[in-house]
Amino acid sequence: MQNNEIIKPAKYFSELEKSILLALVEKYKYVLECKKSDARTIALKQRTWQALAHEYNSQPSVSLRDFKQLKKCWENIKARTKKIMAHERREKVKRSVSPLLSTHVLGKEKIASMLPEQLYFLQSPPEEEPEYHAEAAAQESFAVSNRELCDDEKEFIHFPVCEGTSQPEPSCSAVRITANKNYRSKTSQEGALKKMHEEEHHQQMSILQLQLIQMNEVHVAKIQQIERECEMAEEEHRIKMEVLNKKKMYWERKLQTFTKEWPVSSFNRPFPNSP
């Protein structure tokens, strides 16, 4: 192979290159996957992709890529992962999950953790609601005694009693059903609260990472300014040294000329006698 031959990058990403790209994207995910779309965030994302490309190309055993190629590869991986996750969700609804789907994408769980949940969760087709069986509902969770449920039934359900009528008191199975509904509602509320806290934490992490990148940019700008000042000082010192060397050479040549015109022996001659 000749030395002047240009080596073109490989057309497709290898598995090693994809794993390196995923590791770098996970490092900067709070910036690259930020939902903000203002001009400042877009410019910051582009600078982050450029920094990611520089860090990617510094890795051994990878082909040289620019940030546009890396960004396109990440978008393709995201689209493929979202499609597979949506298909798996539909298959789970149909109770027939295919085990072969989990091998199509490298690190599917890792990629899914970097994507917002609403991106790949598609709306599943509605299913027919199963018939309600009172006996099965009575045998659900909450393995507590009937006395405990009946003692606490006022906390869950209230039945109005009309005067002059003899209505039977509610059974413990009805109280159990109501308690189960309240438990499920409480569980869903706790899940929503936990999800809200996680989103808030992710937003805070995104803001901190943006601030870190901005501080890094300011630090790099200061270093570049100091380097430029050092270069200017070195250039000024070089010019001054050249001027001094020229002056030195000038006076050396002048001294040589003076020595030739006025040799030292002429000063040793005796002066003529004065009249």
From Swiss-Prot:
The keyword Lipid biosynthesis does not apply. There is a cross-link at residue 154 (Glycyl lysine isopeptide (Lys-Gly) (interchain with G-Cter in SUMO2)). The keyword Oxidoreductase does not apply. Residues 211-247 form a coiled coil. It holds the Pfam family Myb_DNA-bind_5. The modification Phosphoserine is found at residues 96, 98, 274. Belongs to the MSANTD3 family. This is Myb/SANT-like DNA-binding domain-containing protein 3. It comes from Bos taurus (Bovine). The lineage of its organism: Eukaryota, Metazoa, Chordata, Craniata, Vertebrata.
